[in-house]
Amino acid sequence: MLPNEAMYPYTAKEARDRGELELWRANFRTNCACAGAIELAIHRDFDGMHLKDGCAKSVIDQYGYRRVGYVLANTLQLHAYDGRYHETNKRWSRTIFVPEDGGHRHTFLIGSHPAVLDGFVSDYRAELEQLQANSNQAMCMGEMTM
């Protein structure tokens, strides 16, 4: 498994050409594990009607914002036809580049019900917005002390 925010940026073919197939494999396995962790978190925090607030946080803590976003975006991009995902979440997913990779993308699709997964995506995005707001506030505070 790769560390939290370390992501291998190339496809399997590019990795093979670069002699970095083991790095690609580690990244791929981590993407698959992240998708599984998302499914487990949803299973744990969905009561049949509502997804518990903060459900995404445990997965973010384990895999990092970047990888969780990448895995979520992959699923939404591959299921763009599904009307159960909110349009704002689908639009957000298109801002993340997930390269075609010879069918490997389909291996780390998240299998949770789309309406519930949509709630998880919204929760993830709220966590990300909070992180960005805190970062901006910290930068402003740093500028004020200079």
Regions found by a protein language model. Give the residues of each.
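Gram-negative host-targeted secretion-system effectors, predominantly Type III and Type IV
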Residues: 1-145
